[in-house]
A protein has these predicted regions:
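Strand-loop-strand
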Residues: 1-152
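Charged, low-complexity interaction regions
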Residues: 156-157
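Short, intrinsically disordered, charge-balanced linker/junction segments flanking boundaries
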Residues: 161-167
Length: 167
């Protein structure tokens, strides 16, 4: 993008313009234990209207994790496709002021079998995480920490979940 930078005779510095990000990477680190590489999505941008520290963010990044969708399926479901891993994107969006952006998350199940069991389970999952912030946070945390989705009603740190996530 085009950026304008000015320094006046008093030493005041201003920036104006848009910086469009076509590609890039952001490494999410938690307690030096969890490191996940997020890919910055095309058309993300940073806009300056004067104050260099007052930039406005409109940035989207995604981390892809291949995981089983079986936690989303009914317990009675028996399909050979259950054990397969499917791409799930953990999406983070930063919007607003550079110093204190609004941060939002989403999970996007990219590909899955066309069977009615999978279609219904994924649709119900998407509806649940869109209408329940606590459920979205629980699922995002599970993907970040354990690289897997959780069945509905399961505690994030249930001992069986910890054991299977670490294995």
């Amino acid at each position: 993008g085009r950026l304008g930078m000015k320094v006046d005779t008093k030493g005041d510095f201003t920036m104006t313009g848009n910086y469009e990000i076509r590609r890039g990477e952001y490494t999410f680190t938690f307690q030096n234990i969890i490191n996940k590489r997020f890919q910055i999505q095309p058309n993300s941008r940073i806009t300056w209207t004067g104050d260099p520290y007052g930039a406005l963010l409109d940035v989207t990044a995604a981390y892809r994790q291949y995981t089983s969708l079986s936690p989303l399926l009914p317990a009675s479901s028996t399909s050979a496709d259950q054990s397969r891993r499917y791409p799930v994107d953990l999406v983070i969006k930063l919007n607003g002021d550079l110093g204190s952006p609004a941060i939002s998350y989403d999970l996007d199940v990219k590909e899955y079998p066309a069977s009615s069991d999978f279609r219904q389970a994924v649709t119900a999952f998407k509806s649940r995480i869109q209408s329940n912030d606590q459920e979205l946070t629980r699922q995002v945390s599970s993907v970040l920490i354990f690289n897997q989705l959780l069945p509905e009603g399961t505690n994030l740190f249930d001992q069986n979940q910890v054991n299977s996530g670490v294995a």
